[in-house]
């Protein structure tokens, strides 16, 4: 069992995820307290043993770790198990005693500040109740003992197995586990490796794990510290809990009355008082050899054990033990007493004497407190202090005179001591390198390939033609993509030509604008200002304006047109009635009418008549259903349709005759209470008789079996009128809601806006209105749309193309441009709407060449899906963009948990540019979402089967309340949910669990004839308030309470589905079970008209696997059906017969065409109608019974064939992917070919595809409206954020009035948690990276400190709150910036005036790899690669392998689990793979270590300056989490200085000279000093084992081996390899620029200078960076220089390095291309 547990809980690679942003959100996480203690002490435990017993310092470290969790907003609690004390019994002496005391003090102390729970064991019933009530989202447990640092606590394998067994316990119980061994804290994010829970909960496995833990704890034995205290000692306990030492000393005196014991007890009493009165800064004492004396050690152990026992006896509420003992100060006092130099502050002396009196009452012969006769015999050698190393901090700074940044720093204050200009030790000859060329340093990597010139005009023309063809093809593709897009109401987008309205517009533009304005001034748009109706002033009559002759003529013509249109509508309606009368099938007649009403706009009177006519038809259908009550219930949808038509017509202006007909219908339905009186109705006879159908049997009636309110809530919720203050507005082509009009007003004022509104609520129009406004203002302004994904970029480019057209006076200017890393269409600096991604926009804003010319033109930046700022990878860049934005912004999101807080931060940013930002929050979706769970399906045999194959159980939101402590805050209720909840509460209510009669629907809605959505929302709030009251009652969670009965009632149906699934499969959640249920579920959705559907699975391979299963099952079932179906066989016989007579028919038709009359031809066409299906029949096409292809697809058949076969010829995807498209099934994830993905999007919108299986790529704003969303299987990525994003695709506005969200293979507890989890807060990162500072310096330098550069720096430096929702103040940022500049100066990347120099360009172009870019720069400077290049000619592969090993340590690192690495030792299964990356050679690691040491020295200076300027802002004597102050002001002359370290670290004897690494130093600086490890360019080489996947791929090129041996996921391989390929391309490109290799001819000349017999392959730079992976050129050269002129001109040693890198890239990319080709 233990071996199985070890295997299941030991991961190979630590794949880190953002614990909060990507997983837990605000859900409760349970932290094992003992795991946390061991994790902290594994770094350093000397302060609990050899370095003195420092309980306060241990508490400080514990609080500091927990404070990090708090700052990251982790919702956590800590649990301890009493029997786990046995874990500490493996240790001896002082360490054992201090560990146990620390554990007990920690529990007691933390309980006051964070939730801490203590249970007897895992078998404790209270533990089970706790888990059942709180349902933690995950556990955090220690998993490894390999992170122990030198001096840290040694953790045995047996102890680790206890923790691993606990991990197994949690996983078996369905709870994921975060592994503490992988934990990192980056900025304010917790990065950790998470083990997903097992698919099926196993009570047997849970019990086995619990028993195994008990067995291990028994092996460890019981704690060896328990003692018995005399009653007198307990009685003598002082009321002041902080003086517990008094009681301990009394026990020690009574237990063993030796002279030494008596004197040490006196010291203990004095120590007690000194801990209360002494300042924390004066407690840094040197260490003494006396501490190791056995007698002293024995006394301390006895004291610690006594104290631990006494703490057990005290009330748990008594606090104040965090500073219970100071071992170093205790020894100091003993030494002073032994030397006769005992001197303590007077205040301590007085309080000590009062305590000593209590002792004398117990032990009268104890003597004088300040007399220590036995201590005088202590050897003087033991009293000599151990020397504490002290080092001076270099406080000098280099000169810095940047014209923009320097003014922010006071010269006298900062230049305390001038540092000499830094000298750079390097093998590079900078005099021969192109380092000061502004055009070169200002180039971003995205544009580097464009700087290469071939020197051949023919090649230039060919390349230009190729680019032109690509652009034309892209435009053609955009046109097709755009034609599939639809607007908010489901109609195709209409392209409008924009005319400039500004002062510089042309005469033609002004005339066009005037005409356009007159068109807009229709009755709908008149008398409005900013969307609000203008009121006429009272007492004044508006005069009709005097019209000119021409205007009178135009008015008459318009009136005649209106009259003609009205007459035309009447004619059409009369013809339509005649056509409808010929349709015998009433269902078809009603459907035809609905179609007519949806396709065009009619005169209001005629529309009323059409709807009344449809009511008459529906009443006939309803009559046929009313012969039984079952018939009414079964066909209630007909009554819903009748009521829907009435609800549309009734509020409109109607005639007496129409109202009479409606009232008669309402009376027949039993809804008399809906009828309302109306005055002054016009009279106009109906054009048809309206008579209610007669019932054959008088026993029956047409009444609906519900009251009107009940009927509307239960069945009419999706049809309720749902506008939220809608009103006409001339600015847009629809009636915007109130919040939308408010947004338009803000945009018109050129102010910023942050909009948070659910998916499908109508956010999209904001972006397009902002674009249109900029387009209309002038021809120069630019609006930028920033999309988080390239898929969204593609869609937006098509949508902008479909919406806007504009003619420009100058050639080359375009409306829009797309610019991503992959491609660019149109000129991004010569367009008005730029659509891009964060990295590219950041690149453009920081380009000096654009700073003065293009950046000032930016009028607005639109950030869609702004919540992505919280993501670990791209969020940092997006946060930097918000800081850099020089204009008003639009920020849009549907999923922000803290909009008010985030808006405050955005306001601060925009305030620097004088742009106010407004928050718009809209809480309600346009369409409700109905959730269901599916399972227990039978075998699929075709879509024609009747009945359901599986079970669908709809999930009532109340079922999820057990996972939210009964809160309904985050639950959304449909109207029918509210109704069901009311009656269920009424059923179980009793005692305190009451429900008001006012909530009875018939009473609540009695005065509301037609319930609107806003009315239902009000009712929802009140019903939720009642259930929240129930949940807050003391006995709400008791097993038999009404509240629990209510939850069980709603949980029963979904549980039945899960149970039925378990009866058919061993697991309801396995991939096999999902694959067997998926096709039956799709069939059932098809029969219920709930397609199209998007099925989300968060694993790419599983998406493809499930799609393949569906497709192949359809094909196989179709084959079986065709073989056995007589219907199909008969159809084939007819088809073959028809084919055999094709020639004969053709001849007859030709003869008939020549001789027949027109009448004969018409008759022939009618007779041929019955067999026309044969003409379109193709036996090769999928049968409709086995295809999900939409019957109403707008994609032409020939066009579909052409496009899909073109896709097949490109071999972009496997053939079955294309065949599946024919059957209406698609796949969508970011790893697929872009052309395939886009055709999937187009076909889905056009209705050809009705099933798409996708990852989260489709959840971020992609316009693919669907009726149903289904989640296939559980995943760590299926969190609240992704759930809300994906579920929002269902029921999109303009398409469906109700969306459906299904779950297949997702555990019920996970479903309920998703429904109740609050969207978490946006957590930003600290965006001022070292590379960004370097880029800003380049911006200032390259733009000659232009206005844009100055404004950018001003916004950064003057911003009071710098990090999203953080607390970084401006002075902290200024300090950080100055020392980043100091680092860049010392590393030779900036000169004294802030200009980038030397290797700055290379470092900047690798900015996305920070801090690895600085490590690479240092290795290049130090000649590491030069040395390897020396053997490149003779030992080519070895040289390349050495290079790749170094690069693998720098880029794309995946940390491995040390325990797993140990299992690989001696393995014979890894012959072709290295798996574990070899450590860097010592001489290379030394280069990186020397760099880290320079950084450490620099930031010691930083800490000194920070403290000197008094900007810490946090009291040095406060604990970081509890804010507990260590009181005291008394001084002690013998204390040492802690320097820049935290005063708490001084307790353990640390100062700045005693820390060896930067990360260790950062852990020990005062809490108020702003220093972030993640933002310092430290590397820490050979820190941990890393996966050698890049080296292995370079060696064997096998993807399968990467999966099998390196344990990489197939879905991530392409991306990590592509990232490394990009790094190689960047390095090669930058080295080529440094060498001034501008043209291919330059490279060839350089290579020809290297001649010899040793052949070495190389690749020209233009080819290496080509987008189409051109054929590589081979060149032969040796290391012998042949041209002295070239040697003088070029750094030939660096050129050898360049050639080596080109070859490394060549060989890596060759394998990489083979992998993805």
Swiss-Prot record:
* Compositionally biased region (Polar residues): 494-506
Gene Ontology MF: a single term = ATP binding
Where in or outside the cell it occurs: the entry states: Cytoplasm
Q: Which Pfam families match?
A: DEAD, Helicase_C, PIN-like_DDX60
PROSITE patterns with a match to the protein in the record:
HELICASE_ATP_BIND_1, HELICASE_CTER
Q: Which residues form a coiled coil?
A: none
Q: Where is this motif: DEAH box?
A: 864-867
Q: Where is this region: Disordered?
A: 446-468, 494-550
Q: Does the keyword Nucleotide-binding apply?
A: yes
Where is there biased composition of kind Basic and acidic residues? 507-518
User: Which family does the similarity line name?
Assistant: Belongs to the helicase family. SKI2 subfamily.
Q: What is this protein called?
A: Uncharacterized helicase C694.02
What organism is the protein native to? Schizosaccharomyces pombe (strain 972 / ATCC 24843) (Fission yeast)
């Amino acid at each position: 069992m233990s071996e199985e547990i070890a295997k299941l809980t030991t991961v190979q690679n630590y794949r880190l995820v953002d614990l909060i942003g990507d997983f837990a959100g605000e859900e409760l996480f349970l932290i094992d307290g003992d795991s946390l203690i061991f994790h902290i002490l594994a770094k350093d435990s000397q302060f609990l043993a050899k370095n003195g017993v420092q309980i306060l310092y241990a508490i400080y470290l514990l609080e500091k770790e927990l404070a990090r969790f708090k700052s990251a907003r982790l919702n956590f609690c800590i649990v301890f198990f009493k029997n786990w004390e046995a874990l500490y019994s493996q240790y001896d002496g002082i360490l054992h005693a201090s560990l146990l005391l620390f554990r007990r003090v920690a529990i007691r102390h933390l309980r006051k500040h964070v939730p801490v729970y203590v249970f007897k064991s895992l078998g404790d019933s209270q533990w089970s109740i706790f888990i059942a009530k709180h349902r933690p989202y995950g556990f955090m447990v220690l998993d490894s003992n390999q992170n122990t640092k030198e001096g840290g606590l040694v953790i045995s394998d047996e102890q680790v197995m206890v923790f691993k067994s606990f991990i197994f316990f949690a996983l078996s119980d369905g709870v994921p586990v975060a592994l503490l061994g992988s934990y990192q804290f980056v900025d304010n994010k917790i990065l950790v490796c998470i083990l997903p829970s097992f698919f099926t909960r196993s009570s047997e496995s849970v019990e086995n794990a619990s028993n195994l833990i008990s067995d291990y704890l028994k092996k460890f034995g019981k704690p060896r510290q328990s003692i018995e205290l005399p009653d007198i000692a307990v009685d003598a306990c002082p009321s002041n809990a902080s003086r517990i030492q008094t009681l301990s000393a009394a026990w020690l005196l009574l237990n063993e009355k030796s002279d030494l014991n008596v004197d040490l007890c006196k010291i203990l009493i004095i120590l007690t008082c000194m801990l209360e009165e002494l300042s924390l800064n004066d407690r840094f004492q040197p260490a003494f050899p006396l501490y190791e004396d056995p007698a002293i050690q024995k006394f301390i152990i006895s004291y610690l054990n006594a104290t631990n026992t006494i703490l057990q006896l005290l009330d748990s509420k008594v606090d104040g033990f965090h500073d219970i003992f100071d071992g170093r100060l205790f020894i100091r006092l003993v030494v002073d007493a032994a030397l006769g130099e005992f001197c303590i502050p007077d205040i301590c002396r007085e309080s000590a004497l009062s305590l000593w009196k209590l002792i004398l009452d117990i032990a009268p012969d104890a003597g004088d407190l300040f007399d220590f006769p036995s201590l005088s015999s202590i050897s003087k050698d033991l009293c000599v202090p151990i020397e504490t190393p002290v080092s001076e901090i270099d406080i000098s700074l280099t000169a810095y005179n940047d014209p923009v940044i320097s003014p922010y720093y006071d010269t006298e204050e900062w230049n305390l001591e001038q540092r000499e200009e830094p000298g750079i030790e390097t093998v590079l000859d900078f005099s021969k390198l192109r380092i000061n060329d502004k055009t070169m340093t200002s180039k971003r990597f995205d544009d580097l390939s464009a700087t290469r010139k071939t020197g051949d005009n023919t090649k230039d023309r060919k390349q230009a033609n190729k680019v032109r063809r690509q652009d034309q093809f892209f435009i053609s593709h955009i046109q097709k993509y755009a034609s599939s897009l639809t607007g908010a109401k489901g109609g195709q987008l209409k392209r409008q030509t924009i005319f400039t309205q500004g002062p510089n517009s042309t005469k033609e533009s002004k005339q066009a604008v005037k005409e356009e304005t007159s068109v807009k001034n229709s009755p709908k748009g008149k008398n409005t200002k900013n969307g609000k109706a203008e009121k006429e002033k009272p007492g004044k009559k508006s005069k009709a304006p005097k019209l000119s002759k021409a205007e009178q003529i135009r008015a008459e013509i318009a009136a005649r047109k209106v009259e003609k249109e009205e007459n035309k509508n009447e004619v059409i309606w009369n013809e339509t009635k005649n056509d409808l009368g010929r349709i015998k099938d009433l269902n078809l007649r009603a459907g035809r009418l609905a179609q007519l009403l949806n396709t065009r706009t009619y005169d209001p009177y005629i529309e009323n008549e059409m709807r009344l006519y449809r009511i008459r038809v529906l009443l006939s259908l309803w009559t046929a259903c009313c012969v039984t009550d079952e018939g009414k219930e079964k066909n209630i949808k007909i009554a819903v349709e009748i009521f829907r038509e009435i609800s549309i017509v009734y509020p409109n202006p109607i005639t007496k005759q129409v109202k009479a007909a409606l009232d008669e219908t309402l009376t027949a339905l039993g809804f008399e209470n809906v009828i309302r009186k109306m005055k002054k109705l016009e009279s106009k006879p109906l054009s048809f008789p309206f008579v209610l159908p007669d019932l054959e049997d008088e026993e029956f009636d047409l009444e609906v079996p519900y009251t009107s309110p009940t009927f509307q809530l239960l069945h009419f919720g999706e049809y309720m009128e749902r506008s939220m203050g809608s009103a006409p507005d001339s600015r847009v082509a629809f009636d915007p809601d109130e919040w939308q009009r408010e947004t338009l007003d803000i945009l018109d004022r050129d102010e910023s806006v942050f909009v948070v509104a659910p998916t499908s609520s109508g956010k999209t129009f904001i972006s397009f209105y902002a674009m249109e406004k900029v387009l209309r203002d002038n021809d120069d302004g630019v609006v930028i749309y920033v999309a988080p994904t390239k898929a969204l970029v593609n869609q937006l480019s098509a949508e902008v193309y479909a919406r806007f057209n504009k003619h420009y006076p100058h050639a080359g200017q375009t409306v829009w441009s797309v610019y991503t890393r992959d491609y660019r269409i149109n000129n991004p600096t010569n367009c008005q709407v730029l659509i891009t991604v964060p990295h590219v926009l950041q690149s453009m804003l920081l380009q000096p060449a654009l700073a003065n010319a293009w950046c000032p033109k930016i009028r607005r930046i639109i950030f869609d899906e702004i919540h992505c700022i919280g993501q670990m990878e791209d969020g940092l860049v997006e946060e930097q963009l918000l800081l850099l934005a020089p204009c008003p912004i639009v920020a849009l999101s549907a999923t922000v948990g803290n909009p008010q807080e985030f808006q405050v931060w955005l306001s601060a940013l925009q305030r620097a540019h004088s742009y106010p930002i407004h928050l718009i929050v809209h809480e309600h979706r346009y369409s409700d979402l109905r959730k269901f769970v599916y399972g227990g399906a039978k075998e699929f045999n075709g879509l024609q089967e009747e009945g359901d194959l599986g079970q669908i159980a709809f999930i009532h939101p109340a079922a999820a309340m057990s996972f939210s402590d009964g809160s309904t805050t985050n639950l959304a209720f449909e109207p029918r949910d509210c109704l069901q909840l009311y009656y269920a509460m009424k059923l179980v209510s009793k005692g305190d669990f009451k429900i008001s009669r006012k909530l009875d629907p018939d009473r609540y809605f009695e005065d509301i004839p037609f319930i609107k959505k806003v009315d239902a929302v009000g009712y929802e709030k009140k019903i939720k308030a009642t259930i929240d009251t129930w949940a807050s009652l003391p006995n709400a969670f008791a097993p038999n309470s009404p509240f629990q009965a209510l939850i069980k009632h709603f949980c029963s149906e979904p549980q039945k589905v899960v149970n039925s699934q378990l009866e058919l499969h061993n697991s309801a959640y396995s991939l096999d079970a999902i694959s067997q249920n998926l096709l039956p579920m799709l069939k059932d959705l098809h029969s219920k008209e709930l397609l199209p559907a998007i099925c989300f699975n968060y694993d790419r391979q599983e998406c493809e696997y499930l799609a393949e299963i569906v497709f192949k099952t359809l094909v196989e079932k179709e084959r079986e059906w065709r073989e056995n179906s007589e219907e199909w066989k008969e159809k084939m016989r007819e088809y073959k017969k028809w084919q055999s007579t094709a020639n004969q028919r053709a001849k007859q038709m030709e003869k008939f065409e020549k001789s027949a009359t027109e009448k004969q031809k018409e008759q022939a066409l009618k007779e041929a109608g019955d067999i026309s299906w044969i003409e379109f029949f193709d036996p090769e096409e999928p049968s409709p019974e086995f295809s999900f292809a939409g019957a109403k697809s707008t994609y032409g058949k020939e066009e579909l064939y052409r496009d899909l076969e073109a896709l097949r010829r490109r071999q972009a995807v496997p053939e079955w992917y294309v065949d599946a498209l024919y059957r209406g099934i698609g796949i969508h994830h970011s790893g697929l070919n872009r052309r395939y993905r886009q055709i999937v999007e187009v076909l889905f919108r056009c209705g050809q595809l009705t099933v798409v299986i996708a990852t989260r790529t489709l959840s971020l704003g992609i316009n693919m409206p669907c009726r149903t969303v289904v989640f296939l299987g559980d995943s760590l990525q299926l969190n609240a954020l992704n759930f809300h994003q994906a579920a929002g695709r269902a029921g999109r506005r303009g398409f469906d009035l109700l969306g459906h969200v299904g779950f297949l293979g997702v555990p019920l507890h996970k479903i309920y948690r998703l429904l109740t989890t609050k969207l978490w807060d946006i957590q930003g990162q600290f965006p001022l990276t070292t590379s960004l500072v370097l880029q800003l310096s380049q911006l200032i330098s390259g733009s000659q400190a232009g206005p844009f550069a100055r404004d950018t720096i001003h916004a950064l430096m003057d911003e009071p709150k710098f990090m999203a929702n953080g607390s970084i103040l401006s002075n902290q940022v200024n300090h950080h910036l100055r020392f980043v500049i100091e680092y860049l100066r010392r590393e030779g990347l900036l000169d004294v005036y802030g200009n980038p120099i030397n290797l700055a360009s290379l470092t900047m172009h690798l900015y996305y790899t920070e801090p690895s870019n600085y490590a690479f720069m240092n290795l290049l400077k130090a000649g590491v690669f030069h040395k390897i290049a020396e053997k490149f000619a003779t030992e080519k592969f070895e040289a390349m392998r050495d290079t790749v090993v170094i690069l693998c340590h720098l880029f794309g690192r995946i940390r491995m689990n040390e325990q797993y690495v140990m299992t690989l030792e001696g393995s014979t299964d890894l012959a072709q793979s290295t798996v574990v990356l070899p450590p860097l050679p010592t001489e290379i690691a030394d280069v990186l270590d020397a760099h880290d040491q320079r950084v450490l020295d620099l930031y010691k200076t930083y800490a000194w300056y920070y403290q000197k300027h008094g900007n810490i802002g946090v009291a040095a004597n406060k604990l970081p989490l509890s804010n507990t102050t260590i009181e005291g002001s008394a001084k002690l002359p013998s204390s040492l200085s802690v320097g820049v370290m935290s005063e708490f670290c001084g307790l353990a004897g640390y100062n700045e000279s005693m820390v060896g690494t930067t990360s260790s130093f950062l852990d020990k600086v005062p809490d108020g000093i702003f220093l972030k490890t993640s933002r310092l360019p430290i590397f820490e080489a050979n820190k941990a084992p890393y996966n050698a996947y890049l080296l292995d791929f370079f060696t064997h090129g096998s993807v399968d081996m990467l999966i099998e041996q390196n344990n990489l996921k197939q879905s991530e391989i392409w991306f990590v390899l592509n990232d490394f390929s990009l790094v190689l391309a960047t390095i090669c490109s930058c080295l080529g620029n440094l060498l001034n290799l501008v043209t291919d001819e330059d490279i060839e000349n350089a290579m020809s200078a290297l001649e010899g017999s040793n052949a070495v392959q190389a690749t020209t730079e233009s080819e290496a960076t080509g987008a189409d992976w051109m054929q590589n050129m081979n060149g032969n050269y040796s290391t012998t220089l042949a041209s002295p002129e070239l040697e003088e001109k070029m750094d030939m040693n660096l050129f050898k390095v360049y050639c080596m890198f080109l070859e490394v890239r060549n060989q890596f990319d060759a394998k990489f291309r083979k992998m993805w080709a």
